[in-house]
Amino acid sequence: KLDPQATYVIGVSGGPDSMALLHLAVSMGLDVIVALVNYHKRVDSDLDYELVKAYAKSHGLRLAYLEVNEYTKENFQAQARTIRYRFFVETVHRYQAKGILLAHHADDCVETILMQKARHTRVPYLGIAPLSYYQGVPVYRPCLGVFKEDLAHYCEVEGVAYRIDSSNLENH
């Protein structure tokens, strides 16, 4: 359960899932710091930044922004995740926040279960935990019971702009 008096860092990409979580957090009156990492891997990634920056400004929210321009040639997804999570933790410490909010949803959970089964991964649970810790910082995932389509619908109903990352449409 989230503490309504606490400050949280919320990871936002500009997609429907994170924009829905951001809007919901703002609607609930939570004190949030919007954290965005721009990897510059897509031609239009700066448009994601502009969207998130505009939302943060229009709602009087603080924005923590990291630009990443160099990578090693290894697994980009794993590297991006490490960069992102470390930045979120740094932001938690900078603002003395209580934890990190991420918009992982039911589709992500199903995908993770399928990957765990395909890899025969032994884990204490299947899917994604609603609460985990990264470098001692709590990571909350309040949208795990909601499908991405429903988060997009919420954005449409609430008039919250979002962007579709074309790389998420590719088969992995």
Model-inferred region functions:
Residues 1-172:
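Core alpha/beta nucleotide-donor-binding catalytic domains of modification enzymes
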